[in-house]
Amino acid sequence: MSRKKKPLPLLENITITDVAAEGKSLVRVGDMVVFVPFCVPGDVVDLQIKKKKHSYCEAEVVRFIEYSKVRATPFCEHFGVCGGCKWQNLPYEEQLKAKQKQVYDQLRRIGKVELPEISPIMGSEKTREYRNKLEFGCCNKRWLTREQVASGFKYDNMNGIGFHITGAFDKILPIEKCWLMDDMHNRIRNSIRDYAFEHSLTFFDLREQHGLLRDIIIRNSNSGEWMVIVQFHYDEEGDEQRALALMQHIADSFPEITALMYVNNQKCNDTIGDQDVIVFKGNDHIYEHMEELRFKVGPKSFYQTNTEQAYHLYCVARDFAQLTGNETVYDLYTGTGTIANFVARKASKVVGIEYVPEAIEDAKVNSEINGIDNTSFFAGDMKDILTDEFIAEHGHPDVIITDPPRAGMHPDVVKVIMNAAPKRIVYVSCNPATQARDLQLLDPLYKVEKVQPVDMFPHTPHVENVVLLRIKEFKN
């Protein structure tokens, strides 16, 4: 006979004390740390423990007794259900303080290296409509909120277009209005939804892998161009004609779209990197502008999703590099070569390395359209490409700029960097925790000289951080 699980406790009259990772808040109760979503420091609440581990618990609020004086009123109707903007209830100034503290704590606690004074975080001038790309799932199982379930209302149509819910991969939270991007994207998405409802188009079933309408990607640029990519899943005869009719509706309704494309994706996931993207109308790209440069952005291209803050981020990286025009610069994890091309005119030579071959082709095109002839780009796994032999062939780096994924740099990459011993390393990171780990590995040879956090994503717990490392001078 199985033992009955002991009920998890209810904690009453608890005052939230601090902000934690992943957009949660925390409070210490005895020797236990309790993490709570959708609270801010100063809230007084009753908490129901949902998950108990050895040294921490996860809980949710069952009653607000008193709201914090620093609490902000969320501006989005989907806040608290959608997992996107978890900090809308925290004033932006408090968000910046929390991100500054996060960078300091992680560099100090994980890196354990000597740090200079960390520069004040660069906040985003725009805290709404700051993104240039959003992706929406189309699904035949809409997520119902607790209030909707409690109402007992029966929905005849369970189809929805919106965001996936954490912990429920096969369900979609229907989105009426998202504040992350220019409002035209809401009009485009809702128009597609309304057309699909009116014409009884089937929505994708993630478990059964069938249904016509699957996914929508919307991008815009600071040049005023718009790109829309609709993913379909052809199941039966007539689906292609139905898909093309929807595409014509989009083209007729939104002449502002300069790159309208579609995909017939028969895979189990929604990634399009290995799919044929078909142009329905207009171009297969849009352009972003940065200073005097133009960057071509295709349907598969990576480009920083906050254009204005990306410019400030790249300016910091370029300033930290302290280029005079004589340096050989290596740009590791170069993506589509944005940083490489951005610094090229202040360098003698720039070598870019990136894992994704399509991104490298974009990087080469971006050099070509900007008349930049001192860059070279190479595709492959960083730990396999960046070797002592590669450096011997392509020139010793005076400066290395590295912008790795969230996992940070592979230890083999760090070793090659240490062997090359460039004078300066500019480390751009979207994850200060793994950046701190790598700084510790570099510490025997490098000193952290400058630290500049940059907020790319207001109302989220994510923060970018740029660190300048200078090679240490050893006295004999």
Where are these regions (language model features)?
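Terminal RNA-binding accessory module
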Residues: 1-78, 376, 384
